[in-house]
Design a protein with these regions (language model features):
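Left-handed beta-helix
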Residues: 2-16, 223-423, 428-446, 454, ...
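Conserved N-terminal catalytic core of the sugar/cofactor nucleotidyltransferase
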Residues: 2-21, 28-39, 44-128, 132-140, ...
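Conserved core of the sugar-phosphate nucleotidyltransferase
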Residues: 135-263, 281
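Short, surface-exposed secondary-structure boundary micro-motifs
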Residues: 354, 451-452, 459, 471-472
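Noncatalytic nucleic-acid binding interfaces
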Residues: 466
C-alpha cells in the first residue's frame, strides 16, 4: 500500500483549520461486509486504502496532521488507530470518544468545545469517515471557499448536484438571489430551504427543478459559532456538554463523564441546528461524491464490465447483467442475474435486488434483536497487536487462530469464566502466566487456567501464529480484565 504521508497538495494550509473526521457510524446498509465493530470506514471498498485512510489523506492537504480530530467510540478507536498508524504521534491526543452514540450534534459539540479551548479562532471541517470523493483540487477549493464564509460566522455545508431522483438523501435549496462570496466558479449562498428525505415523486421534482442539492453531510464553521448556535437552538444539549467539559476538567471519574454523556438527548446536527439557524449557508461543489450508503451505490463509483456488472473478488459469472457481485474469500458463481446484489463473506451471504439494497438495515435490525454475532463482527477480528479468526465454536468451547505481528503484545489480562490452551504454529511466543515468564517455540503448548493473569507477545522478526482453544461456560470477548495495555484500552484501576 502506498504511504499515505506522500499525499501532498499545493493548497496553502490554514493554521486555524481543524478537520474533524466523524468515525462513529456502523454502516448497517453495507452489511455483511460492514459490521458494528468493523464498520464501513475501515473497509477497502475502492483501491488499496480503506475509506478512513482516504479521508485522512484528503484532509491533510488542507491542514497539518496534528490538527486532525477523530470523533469515534471506544469500540472502534483501536482499529482506527491501527489504520492511521502512520500518524500515530500527530493523532495521539486528538481522539474524542463518545461513550455511547447520541447522534451527530453531541459528538460535534464535544469536539467544538475542545477546539475552542485550544484555539479561539478554530475553524472545523467536519467530514464523515466513509465517503468517496474524487477530485482533490475541487475539494480543496471548496474547503477554501467555505472557510472564507466560516470566518464571517456562517455555518457552511457542501451541496452536491443531484444526478438521479434519490430518496435516501436530504435536499437543500440555496437562495441564489444572494451571493455571500465567490472564488472562481464557486459561490456561497444562504440556505433558503432544507428538505428531509423526500418520496420518489418529490425527488423527481427536485431533480427537474435544477436548484436543489443533496445534503452531503460535510460542514465548515468556526468552533465558537457552532457552539453559539447549539446554545441558541439546543440549550439543553449546550448545558449538558458544558457540564461534561467541567467534569473532564475537574478530574472526575470516567464513569461520571460517561453517565453525563449518556443522559444527553440524541439530536442530529442537521435537524437540531442547521435547519433552524439563520446563519446556514451552502457552497455547491464540483467534485464527484458518494456516501456509499448501500450496496447499490457501488454503481456510481466502481468500474463495470461490458454487461454493466460490478464484480469484486473471485467471481465466475455467466450471463448476468447490471448486478453487483462481491466475493470476500470464497469462489462465488452466478448465472443469469439481472439487477441483483450478491455479497459473500465467510460467515454470512447477502442476496437481494438492487432496488431493495437500502433495506439491508432491516436485516441488521433483525440480527440485533436475535443477538446474532454476525451483526457485530467478522470471524476475523483485527486488533492493534494483530488479529484473531474464529475457526469453530460450540457449547463450552471456541477455537481461534491468533496472529501476533512482530513486536506485538497483548494486554496483561485474566478471564473469570474460561481457561485457554495455546499451541504455537509458527514463531516463538513470549508467555506470561501468573508469576512465570517463558518462551514457547513452534509445536509446543501451554495451559492458561481460569483466573490466571497472562500475556502473549511476539519478540521475534516473523509473525507469530498460535491456535487458542477456550473452554468455559461463557466465552464472550467482554470476559476480560486488563491490568496493563500498550494500546490505551481500559485497564483495571
Amino acid at each position: 500500500m502506498a504511504s499515505l504521508k506522500r499525499s501532498t497538495s499545493k493548497l496553502k494550509r490554514d493554521n486555524h483549520l481543524y478537520p474533524v473526521i466523524m468515525a462513529g457510524g456502523s454502516g448497517t446498509r453495507f452489511w455483511p461486509l460492514s459490521r458494528q465493530l468493523f464498520p464501513k470506514q475501515l473497509l477497502r471498498i475502492m483501491g488499496d486504502e480503506t475509506l478512513i485512510q482516504q479521508t485522512m489523506r484528503r484532509v491533510v492537504c488542507a491542514s497539518a496532521p496534528n490538527r486532525v480530530m477523530i470523533s469515534t467510540n471506544p469500540a472502534q478507536a483501536e482499529s482506527i488507530r491501527v489504520q492511521l498508524s502512520e500518524w500515530k504521534d500527530e493523532l495521539s491526543e486528538n481522539f474524542v470518544l463518545e461513550p455511547e452514540g447520541r447522534n451527530t450534534a453531541p459528538a460535534i459539540a464535544l469536539v467544538a468545545l475542545e477546539l475552542a479551548r485550544r484555539d479561539p479562532d478554530a475553524i472545523m471541517l467536519v467530514v464523515p469517515a466513509d465517503h468517496i470523493i474524487k477530485g482533490q483540487r475541487a475539494f480543496d477549493a471548496a474547503v477554501a471557499m467555505a472557510a472564507t464564509l466560516a470566518k464571517q460566522d456562517y455555518l457552511v455545508t457542501f451541496g452536491i448536484q443531484p444526478i438521479r431522483p434519490e430518496t435516501g438523501y436530504g435536499y437543500i435549496r440555496p437562495n441564489r438571489k444572494v451571493t455571500l462570496g465567490k472564488q472562481g466558479l464557486l459561490k456561497g449562498h444562504p440556505v433558503s430551504r432544507f428538505v428531509e428525505k423526500p418520496n420518489a415523486t418529490k425527488a423527481a421534482q427536485y431533480l427537474k427543478a435544477g436548484d436543489y442539492y443533496w445534503n452531503s453531510g460535510m460542514f465548515v464553521w468556526r468552533a465558537a459559532a457552532i457552539l453559539d448556535e447549539i446554545k441558541r437552538h439546543q440549550p439543553a444539549l449546550s448545558r449538558g456538554i458544558e457540564r461534561i467539559s467541567q467534569l473532564m476538567g475537574s478530574g472526575a471519574t470516567r464513569q461520571s463523564v460517561d453517565e453525563a454523556y449518556r443522559a444527553l438527548t440524541p439530536v442530529s446536527i442537521d435537524t437540531g441546528v442547521m435547519e433552524q439557524s439563520k446563519k446556514a449557508a451552502i457552497v455547491p461543489v464540483f467534485f464527484q461524491w458518494s456516501d456509499i450508503g448501500s450496496w447499490g451505490s457501488l454503481d456510481e463509483v466502481a468500474p463495470k464490465d461490458k454487461a454493466g456488472n460490478v464484480v469484486v473478488g473471485r467471481v465466475v459469472d455467466v450471463g448476468s447483467r447490471r448486478s453487483i457481485v462481491y466475493g470476500d474469500r470464497r469462489l462465488v458463481a452466478t448465472i443469469g442475474l439481472t439487477d441483483m446484489v450478491v455479497v459473500d463473506t465467510p460467515d454470512a451471504t447477502l442476496v437481494c435486488p438492487k432496488s431493495r439494497a437500502q433495506d439491508v438495515k432491516q436485516l441488521v435490525d433483525i440480527l440485533k434483536r436475535q443477538k446474532a454475532p454476525e451483526h457485530l463482527e467478522h470471524l476475523t477480528v483485527h486488533r492493534p497487536w494483530g488479529s484473531y479468526t474464529i475457526l469453530e465454536e460450540g457449547v463450552g468451547y471456541k477455537v481461534k487462530r491468533v496472529t501476533v505481528k512482530p513486536g506485538g503484545r497483548l494486554s496483561l489480562q485474566l478471564h473469570h469464566r474460561r481457561s485457554e490452551h495455546w499451541v504455537v504454529i509458527t514463531g516463538t511466543a513470549r508467555v506470561t502466566r501468573g508469576e512465570e515468564v517463558f518462551d514457547l517455540k513452534t509445536g509446543h503448548s501451554t495451559e492458561i487456567p481460569l483466573e490466571t493473569k497472562h500475556r502473549l507477545e511476539n519478540l521475534g522478526q516473523e509473525t507469530l501464529h498460535i491456535i487458542e482453544v477456550q473452554n468455559g461456560p461463557y466465552l464472550g470477548e467482554d470476559d476480560i480484565v486488563r491490568f496493563q495495555d500498550d494500546y490505551g484500552r481500559n485497564i483495571k484501576p
